[in-house]
Curated annotation (Swiss-Prot):
Necessary cofactors: Mg(2+)
Species whose genome carries this gene: Natronomonas pharaonis (strain ATCC 35678 / DSM 2160 / CIP 103997 / JCM 8858 / NBRC 14720 / NCIMB 2260 / Gabara) (Halobacterium pharaonis)
PANTHER family: ADENINE PHOSPHORIBOSYLTRANSFERASE, URACIL PHOSPHORIBOSYLTRANSFERASE, CHLOROPLASTIC
Protein name: Uracil phosphoribosyltransferase
Gene of this entry: upp
One GO term (biological process): uracil salvage
Lineage per the UniProt record: Archaea, Methanobacteriati, Methanobacteriota, Stenosarchaea group, Halobacteria
InterPro entries in the cross-refs: PRibTrfase_dom (IPR000836), PRTase-like (IPR029057), Upp_A (IPR034331), UPRTase/APRTase (IPR050054), Ura_phspho_trans (IPR005765)
Amino acid sequence: MPIEDRDDAHVITHALAKHTLSELRSDETDQVAFRNGLVELGRLCGYEIIDGMMDTEYVSITTPLAETTGEVVKGLDDVVIVNVLRAATPFVEGLVEAFPHARQGVISAGRDEAAGMNEDGEFPITVDYVKLPDIDADDTVIVADPILATGSTMVAVLEEVLEQGTPERLVVLSAVSAPPGLARVNDSIPSADVLTVSVDERLDEDGYIVPGVGDAGDRAFGT
């Protein structure tokens, strides 16, 4: 699966990922189809991480007929997936299909919508709950949130993750990102690799991505 490298992100260009995201964007996509689409997109993104960001090695294999050499992915047992509640839940469901042996963590964090976005394009963030496994130096940690808008929530989440430990690789995974969010994450946590399916045009005055997909949590959960 191909990846396009930008200065601010790695962008997935695989045709099926783009197709699935296009279905998610449509306001005619109902709640069940939206949720299922996020699951599918999470699975595809997981394969992209394996293909583009993880190393392989050659091993000797004995088949029922002969000795041969196979190629395996290194580090599949050293993956931690962090679910940023709540919109990431179906996204992570698909991601776990690609990483069935991953350890998982959960962080509940969100904007203070009543306070609004300040002049720097940031929201106050409330972190309500953090439950993470141990993070080791040889781990790949994938922090999944389908929407990376202002980056305020993601930076708060990444700071919680790094308090738990410093992994070998820290990946921020989103479906749709906006330039201000990418800039904030890259400036605040330069060790993170951002992987996204689309970098959209801008944020509106309420901090939503345009054209985006709308409120991913509301659309996925029917609220």
